[in-house]
């Protein structure tokens, strides 16, 4: 039993190390983006359940979209590494872009579920939706 626990620990540490190597440092933009990706998917599933429109195809498209966000983030990381100036300029820029998009989607999902959204956020959503 102890061997199994050690293998699990080793696996978790290995995945964390691999993820850090691929995406760079565990900083606030990266953590925020990952949390927003999870929350957007979760609120989307809840919205689909409530509206009785939950579908595996839609869910798969959502997961694919989230995976492609990570691909774009990886491209930004590679550009930063290519520049070799010790900063995460492109990665941070891409992370902020997707944090904004995922945040808007989370708010839209919450509003569709009947969660009251502050008026200022509603106005910002309307302006951003008009620009799409």
Curated annotation (Swiss-Prot):
**UniProt-annotated location(s):** Cell membrane
Q: Transmembrane helix: present as a keyword of the record?
A: yes
What are the entry keywords? Answer: Cell membrane, Membrane, Transmembrane, Transmembrane helix
From the UniProt annotation, give the residues forming the signal peptide.
none
| Chain segments annotated as transmembrane | 19-39, 58-78, 93-113
Going by the entry's taxonomy, the superkingdom of the source organism is recorded as: Bacteria
Q: Name one Pfam family in it.
A: Phage_holin_4_1
InterPro entries from the entry? Phage_holin_4_1
CC terms in the record's Gene Ontology section: plasma membrane
Topology relative to the lipid bilayer, per the entry, is: Multi-pass membrane protein
Q: According to its UniProt record, which protein family does this protein belong to?
A: Belongs to the bacteriophage holin family. Cp-1 holin subfamily.
Under NCBIfam families, the record lists: holin_tox_secr (TIGR01593)
Listed name of the protein:
Uncharacterized 14.9 kDa protein in nagH 3'region
């Amino acid at each position: 039993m102890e061997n199994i626990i050690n293998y699990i620990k080793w696996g978790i540490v290995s995945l964390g190390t691999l993820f850090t190597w691929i995406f760079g440092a565990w900083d606030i933009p990266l953590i925020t983006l990952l949390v927003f990706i999870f929350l957007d998917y979760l609120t989307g599933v809840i919205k689909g359940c409530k509206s009785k429109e939950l579908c595996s195809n839609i869910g798969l498209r959502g997961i694919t979209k989230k995976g492609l966000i990570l691909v774009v983030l990886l491209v930004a990381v590679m550009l930063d590494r290519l520049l070799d100036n010790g900063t995460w300029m492109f990665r941070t820029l891409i992370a902020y872009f997707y944090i904004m998009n995922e945040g808007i989607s989370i708010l839209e999902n919450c509003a569709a579920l009947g969660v009251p959204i502050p008026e200022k956020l509603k106005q910002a959503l309307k302006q951003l939706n008009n620009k799409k």
